[in-house]
C-alpha cells in the first residue's frame, strides 16, 4: 500500500506536469518535426482514440510493443494533440521508463517528471516491484492512463517477443480490475531491429485495439495468463502489419 507521502508526490507531479503540458508537448513536437517524423493517418488514429475515451470511466492501461527509446513519445503524439491533453488531463498518459534511461542527467530527469514518468528499476528487488505496482494501481484507480511495455524492454529480435514477457502487466490488471486495456502497435516502416532512435524522416504505422482480457486463474497463473493474452493481441496486430501494409521493407 502506498504511503500518503508517495500518493501526494504523484498528485503534485500530475498537477505540475498538467500545468506545463502545452510547453512540454509542443517543444517535443518541434523536435519530432525537426527529425521529420510523420504518422500518415494521424487524424484517424486520434479520432479512434477519442471515441474510445468518450466511453471510458475507469483507468486505462495502454499496452504497446517496444523497439526504440522514444516509443512512448510517438504513442502520445499519435493519440492526441497537445491542446486536447490540456483540456482532458486523463488523456495525458503516465509512463514507466527504465530509471537508468531517465536519470542520465538533470535535463532528462526534469523532462521525465514533466512527462509524467514514474521511473522503474528493471529486475529490481521485490519490494521495488511492489512499490511500482502499487503506484500503477493508485493511478488507474483515479481514472488515469498508464503506458506499459509488456516485454519489459526493447525487443532484441525486432518483433514482439513472447519470450521476454514480464508478468507485471497482468499483476497491474489484477490490482485494478476495473481498468480498460488498449493495445497499441507502433512501428517505423523502415525499422528492421531495435535501436535508440528511429531514423530521420521515419514514417510510423500506428494501430489501436481495445482489448478485454479475462482469466479464470488466480495469483501468479492469472498474472501470466493476462500478460500472455495481451502480448498475443500485440503479435496479431504485428502480423497484420506485415501481411497487409504496403511497406518499404
Question: Locations of the language-model features?
Answer:
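Membrane-anchoring hydrophobic helices of lipid-metabolizing enzymes
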Residues: 1-93, 104-116
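A cross-family acyltransferase "interaction/gating" segment
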Residues: 7, 106-109, 145, 152, ...
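A conditional alpha-helix N-cap/helix-loop micro-motif detector
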Residues: 42, 125-130, 162-163, 223
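Generic beta-sheet signal
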Residues: 58-64, 143-150, 179
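Hydrophobic/aromatic beta-strand patches that form the interior of the parallel beta-sheet core
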Residues: 96, 118, 180-184
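Internal catalytic-core helix/loop-beta-alpha segment
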Residues: 118-159
Amino acid at each position: 500500500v502506498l504511503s500518503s507521502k508517495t500518493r501526494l508526490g504523484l498528485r503534485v507531479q500530475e498537477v505540475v506536469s498538467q500545468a506545463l503540458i502545452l510547453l512540454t508537448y509542443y517543444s517535443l513536437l518541434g523536435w519530432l518535426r525537426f527529425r521529420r517524423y510523420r504518422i500518415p493517418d494521424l487524424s484517424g488514429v486520434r479520432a479512434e482514440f477519442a471515441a474510445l475515451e468518450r466511453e471510458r470511466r475507469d483507468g486505462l492501461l495502454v499496452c504497446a510493443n517496444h523497439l526504440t527509446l522514444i516509443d512512448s513519445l510517438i504513442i502520445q503524439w499519435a493519440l492526441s494533440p497537445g491542446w486536447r491533453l490540456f483540456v482532458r488531463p486523463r488523456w495525458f498518459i503516465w509512463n514507466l521508463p527504465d530509471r537508468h534511461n531517465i536519470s542520465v542527467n538533470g535535463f532528462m530527469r526534469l523532462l521525465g517528471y514533466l512527462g509524467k514518468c514514474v521511473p522503474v528499476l528493471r529486475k529490481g528487488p521485490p519490494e521495488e516491484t511492489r512499490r511500482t505496482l502499487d503506484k500503477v494501481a493508485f493511478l488507474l484507480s483515479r481514472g488515469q492512463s498508464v503506458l506499459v511495455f509488456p516485454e519489459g524492454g526493447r525487443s532484441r529480435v525486432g518483433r514482439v517477443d513472447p519470450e521476454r514477457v514480464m508478468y507485471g502487466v497482468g499483476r497491474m490488471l489484477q490490482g485494478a480490475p476495473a481498468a480498460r486495456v488498449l493495445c497499441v502497435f507502433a512501428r517505423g516502416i523502415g525499422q528492421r531491429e531495435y535501436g535508440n532512435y528511429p531514423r530521420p524522416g521515419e514514417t510510423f504505422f500506428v494501430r489501436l485495439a481495445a482489448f478485454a482480457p479475462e482469466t479464470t486463474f488466480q495469483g501468479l497463473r492469472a498474472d501470466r495468463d493476462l500478460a500472455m493474452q495481451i502480448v498475443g493481441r500485440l503479435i496479431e496486430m504485428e502480423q497484420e502489419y506485415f501481411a497487409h501494409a504496403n511497406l518499404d521493407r
